[in-house]
Amino acid sequence: MVKQIMIQGTASDAGKSVLVAGLCRLFKNKGKRVVPFKSQNMSLNSFITATGDEMGRAQVFQAEAAGVFPDVRMNPVLLKPTNDRQSQVIFMGAILDNMDAVTYHDFKQTLIPKIQAVYQSLADENDIIVLEGAGSPAEINLNDRDIVNMGMAKMVDAPVVLVADIDKGGVFASIYGTIMLLNEEERARIKGVIINKFRGDVALLQPGIDMIEELTNVPVIGVIPYANLQLEEEDSVSLSGKNYVPDSNALLDIAIICLPRISNFTDFHSLEIQPEISLRYIRNLADFGKPDLVIIPGSKNTLEDMAFLEESGLKKAIQNFAENAGKVIGICGGYQMLGKKMLDPNQVESKQLEIAGLGLLDTETIFLDQKRTTQITGVTHSGEAVEGYEIHMGETKRGESTSPFCEIKAVNGNEETHQDGAISVNKNIIGTYIHGIFDNDVFLGNLFDELLTRKNKSVYPHEIINLKEHKEQEYDKLAALLEANIQMDQLEKIMKGEKICVSTQKPAIKE
């Protein structure tokens, strides 16, 4: 019979996703067949599986940590906000509809038996399932129809460990408030608490641990030290802490336009881990500076984000940058914005029927009702072999003054040839639908060399850090960190359904 443990949090960005990934790697290293599971994920960071199904990126990196291929069953429901009131609802990798919050709140009850069936199919194939909740279980206005926190735990009778982020402050209030806002049945499901991102001497924390255990009668089974691990961040909340000031000591200054509806910002994780590269996010005109490369990322609402560029003055700044021989790369929605105009006659993305683009590429995009979701391999215009994935509802046509960026050779593992993207005559402006393009080492190294040559400097002096190899190392570091700082004997008892009590054995933090 499958063992299970659910990680819920006191808030978004408390560390649930990372903790699930770490536990998956820890159990994998012990020889267990383990998979992650999150019934419903709201995120604009998504991935396309080998079968062409769309799922949340968080469950992808958790699957990697577990040593298994991403499977859409690990995240059956994906919500992708299109604006502040509506989301695209995706079930088992395929679009169902666009729904507002009220409509979806009523609709999601119909998903319960389907979610249960999906979960059971994973349970039949594995030894352990590590479930992840969303946000906080104490959203009392939503709990009557919850399918991702206590509602999910109840569906499969999973024990819960609550994780709280001490780095933001107010950790004991968040633990107590979360637990006390739950009803008696839900409260009984919380078998342990983990305090995350602690800095300092745990002895100073101990009086608070003693008091919170007495107040809640729930044991604190771990205190995880703050660790500077280079892992993908899935939650858009994490963007608020991203750098916007260039590093004057770096070889290259790369600026990403932080769109209001930015999607798939995990595309830039490969850039973040490279030595002597300054990666920053531009939120307004004052942040623009003098970058060596500007990247316009993907967007879940390209037309509205294009309007943001116009209103903020960033449109003119990007155009001026390009006119002065600046290098600009657009990914997916960013590619669409580089063109002359975008048309949305069926109002697929917004109520705007048409909007002018940046005009840096001789292209036009029309939005269609059908989404393209594929994994691809191909060869770029300069001969680099690349792989990645596509997620878009737009069809972009190139004009005569552009050439294709990439010749696609295979789609979802099957031989299929077509052209992707566009390049300007002077080669300074590139647009592509390929997410993950920067994860290709040769392409990235050549890009760095080109940018440095433009500055009359020698080629990039470092070997490109391979993202897959780097992540494997980070997953192992994370697993070791958790094993050293969680009372694993207590966690094992929780997973077996054994009762554990508040004890005198206190967590001792280990680096």
From Swiss-Prot:
All residue ranges annotated as the GATase cobBQ-type domain in the record: 251-443
CDD domains linked: CobQ_N, GATase1_CobQ
Family annotation (SUPFAM superfamilies): Class I glutamine amidotransferase-like (SSF52317), P-loop containing nucleoside triphosphate hydrolases (SSF52540)
Pathway note: Cofactor biosynthesis; adenosylcobalamin biosynthesis
InterPro entries, sorted: Class_I_gatase-like, CobQ/CobB/MinD/ParA_Nub-bd_dom, CobQ_GATase1, CobQ_N, CobQ_synth, GATase_3, P-loop_NTPase
Active site annotation, chain numbering: 332 (nucleophile), 435
Name of this chain's protein: Cobyric acid synthase
